Amino acid sequence: MKHIFTRALTTFTFTLLFLASFGQQGTELLIQANRATLERDYTQAIALYDQYIKLNPEDFRGYFNRGTTEMNARKYTEAEQDFTKTLSLNPVYKEAYYYRGQSFVKQKKYDLAIKDYTHILDKDPRSVPFLKLRAKAYSENKQNDLALQDLDFAIGIAKLEGDLYKRRAELKIVLHDIDGALKDYHAVGKLMPEYKMVHYIKGNLYLEIKETDFACEEYKLALDNDVVVADRAYEENCQ
């Protein structure tokens, strides 16, 4: 949810800047609605967008901004409808596919989310953000092999993006590929030093394959990084 709000913040900021030269009726309503969204007063924002849309029913931005606000308010069905309307007015608006896909995922409509992400990837097959989104949707839809393909391809494009290795490691655990997961978590440790849980997770994985000495080394590193949960694992397995 934090990621959705952050992305929406960027969109709304852009809209506010654009509106300086926007003379269409209802401009002030849209500014007020955007401001209410930024202040997380979603009920007020939606009411203002409603008024704006009545005045400007052919302006896709009213529906799109209302949709992102509905996403933050967890009104996913309404958001889906607004993003669909956005795309009927502006079929090439990439952000609407992003958000509609997210609304589908929240409603567990994974096939529809995958369809939206694939629509963008057909035009831009090297889009790492959309590869990550589709991989997540595939995974939620129990299509783990396809999710792995997307993550493999994304890593080939963005070799230094630690989050990709983390996602792939988590997927490999589901696929019972412990050795593969350990290799990816090793990359995570190098690329994401701020992720303190990596040594604790690696310790648990080493225990699964009966490599207790390696597990204990990882638990020690986790404790050095103030990962409190590693203390019990170390006591139970390493003393």
Question: Which residues does each PLM region occupy?
Answer:
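Helix-start (N-cap) detector for alpha-helical repeat units in TPR-like alpha-solenoids
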Residues: 25-27, 60-61, 94-95, 128-129, ...
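Terminal, low-structured helical/coil segments at or just beyond the last alpha-helical repeat
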Residues: 26, 204, 208-239
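Register position in tetratricopeptide repeats
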Residues: 38-39, 72-73, 106-107, 136, ...
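Canonical tetratricopeptide repeat
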Residues: 65, 99, 133, 167, ...
